[in-house]
């Protein structure tokens, strides 16, 4: 197992030096879900939420959240994002909305945290917009699905966990 990179030899936290790393295309894909009452899911899919287009606003929130990742995660590098894609899917069988975010950059460090942050913010936004009708919604299963680029190459959940 690799050592933790955000701590120096004395155990003090520090921001990792990425200055010597090569600039490469980097991609990360994250996923998460929010489960809710079937009636709440119906409100979302029908576009009947009092606060507006739930998924449209959650998409914009995810993009904004990805851009703010370095402000929220203390040792995360601020990076120039080249693309953020946000996809939602409705799962009637379990009364859930699934969110998948793809983050891309050309840089010296990965975009995993940006993809994970965007996913989290999208799901939190859905909760915020629907909490008046369903305070029991459950957010979960937020995880990295895939990462490409950089020295460590390609990683995919389930293939080399």
Curated annotation (Swiss-Prot):
Pfam families: MoaC (PF01967). Keywords: Lyase, Molybdenum cofactor biosynthesis. GO terms for biological process: Mo-molybdopterin cofactor biosynthetic process. It catalyses: (8S)-3',8-cyclo-7,8-dihydroguanosine 5'-triphosphate = cyclic pyranopterin phosphate + diphosphate. It comes from the Bacteria. Its EC number is 4.6.1.17. It is an enzyme of class 4 (lyase). Substrate binds at residues 75-77, 113-114. The active site is at 128. One of its GO terms (molecular function) is cyclic pyranopterin monophosphate synthase activity. Gene3D superfamilies: Molybdopterin cofactor biosynthesis C (MoaC) domain. Pathway: Cofactor biosynthesis; molybdopterin biosynthesis. Homohexamer; trimer of dimers. Belongs to the MoaC family. Catalyzes the conversion of (8S)-3',8-cyclo-7,8-dihydroguanosine 5'-triphosphate to cyclic pyranopterin monophosphate (cPMP). This is Cyclic pyranopterin monophosphate synthase. The gene is moaC.
């Amino acid at each position: 197992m690799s050592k933790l990179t955000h701590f120096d030899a004395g155990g003090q936290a520090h921001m990792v030096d990425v200055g010597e790393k090569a600039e490469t295309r980097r991609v990360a894909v994250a996923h998460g879900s929010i489960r809710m009452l079937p009636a709440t899911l119906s409100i979302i899919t029908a576009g009947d939420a009092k606060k507006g287009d739930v998924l449209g606003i959650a998409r914009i929130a995810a993009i904004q959240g990805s851009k703010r990742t370095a402000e929220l995660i203390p040792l995360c590098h601020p990076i120039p994002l080249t693309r953020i894609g946000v996809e939602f899917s409705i799962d009637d069988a379990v009364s859930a909305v699934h969110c998948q975010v793809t983050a891309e950059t050309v840089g010296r460090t990965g975009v995993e945290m940006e993809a994970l942050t965007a996913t989290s913010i999208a799901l939190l936004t859905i909760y915020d917009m629907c909490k008046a009708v369903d305070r029991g919604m459950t957010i979960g299963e937020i995880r990295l699905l895939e990462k490409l680029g950089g020295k460590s190459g390609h990683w995919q959940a389930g293939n080399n966990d």
